[in-house]
Amino acid sequence: IQRTGELLGIEVIKLANALHASGDNTSFKMRTDSLQFSTRADKNRKVNVHIATFLINDFAIAVCPGEMFVQLQLEWKAKARLADVTPLFFGYTYVKGRSPGYVADVRSAALGGFGAEGGNRIQVGGGEAIINKHLESLYILNDQRASIHLK
């Protein structure tokens, strides 16, 4: 483990030395949203899921509580790249409210299995709605990228 840490440290230093600023200005934009879903067990109960989307230069960051299934994360990354950005996704993050727990994509919810059945607090399809809201926010931020510049 010691050797693995040393090798990882060497690679981190190489990467850090290879990074260069993209210009004199740094842009930073963010949007927060709250989406309301029915719970999976009781359609009359509601859960608010709070998310945030950031655009820092050409890095797009989606922040969401709970554990989004990997298919949803891959969808975010593929569609975010269409906006000519480097997408990052962070789950288990707290913006506000309560965690939705496991968030399965529709296909995984239909197939069942670990995390796709009883662990889902929000309705089936909620994961896709969260990803779509992140993408909507990203595209809005990307169109406004030049509106805030920090030196």
Give residue spans per PLM region.
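Non-catalytic substrate/cofactor recognition surfaces at enzyme active-site rims
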Residues: 1-151
